[in-house]
A protein has these predicted regions:
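Leucine-biased recognition of intrinsically disordered, low-complexity hydrophobic segments
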Residues: 7, 11-12, 23
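Glycine-rich phosphate/adenosyl-contacting loop at the front of the ribokinase-like
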Residues: 18-79
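Glycine-rich, highly charged phosphate/nucleotide-binding loops
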Residues: 78-94
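Short acidic/histidine-rich motifs immediately flanking catalytic phosphotransfer sites
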Residues: 98-103
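Conserved beta-alpha-beta core of the PfkB/ribokinase-like small-molecule kinase fold
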Residues: 106-186
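Conserved small/polar residues in nucleotide/adenosyl-binding loops
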Residues: 189-191
Length: 191
């Protein structure tokens, strides 16, 4: 064979001994633009999203909105490196290249300028599915970085989404209700 492997033109069906012809078609993986923070410590954010999507056969395209030394949930005040200037340039570059995204996914957006990046991505790729994880709080409390203005911007972003993925606390914040954990706990006790 001269060192070249030959592609099989048929698939053997187990337990039957029959071969069925098949065609091999190159398939370009789906591209997901992941607009999220990158936390150096904390098992969250882009550090978790990127490998999960890759294993699923999806091509994740990272757009870090901010690089944090740790996540913002109780580990003190993290060191921060804002990614908005980079994000603007990256979006323009992808658009100039003619990159098409099948999906745009947003996670933690720690400021209004970061929400603006997501809004711009939604406008540049209107046909992409839009998934918003409105990361704003947990366990009945909003994160310390969440302001009323940020909540309003994230609420508006959710209105443009095809799918939103709030946890219980975030759903309460979006609905302008006081987040609480007691109601959920009482409901679970009576199941």
């Amino acid at each position: 064979m001269g060192g070249c492997a030959r592609l099989k033109s048929a698939l053997l069906i187990p337990h039957t001994g029959k071969e069925v012809p098949y065609l091999i078609h190159p398939v370009e993986p789906k591209k997901v633009l992941c607009i999220h923070d990158l936390s150096g410590m904390g098992r969250c954010s882009l550090a978790v999203i990127l490998p999960v999507l890759s294993v699923m056969g999806v091509q994740p395209v990272a757009l870090p909105t901010v690089v944090l030394s740790t996540h913002t949930g109780g580990l003190g005040t993290p060191a921060r490196l804002d990614g908005c200037a980079y994000g603007e340039q990256a979006l323009e570059h992808y658009h100039a290249l003619g990159v098409e995204f099948d999906c745009i996914y947003t996670g933690y957006l720690g400021g209004e300028d970061q929400v603006a990046l997501a809004e711009k991505a939604f406008a540049l790729w209107p046909a992409a599915k839009k998934i918003v994880d409105p990361v704003m709080g947990d366990n009945g409390k909003a994160y310390s970085t969440v302001t009323p203005a940020l909540i309003d911007r994230i609420r508006a972003l959710c209105g443009a989404a095809d799918l939103i993925l709030p946890n219980y606390t975030e759903a309460q914040i979006l609905l302008q209700r006081q987040p609480q954990t007691e109601l959920l706990t009482l409901s679970l006790i009576h199941i």
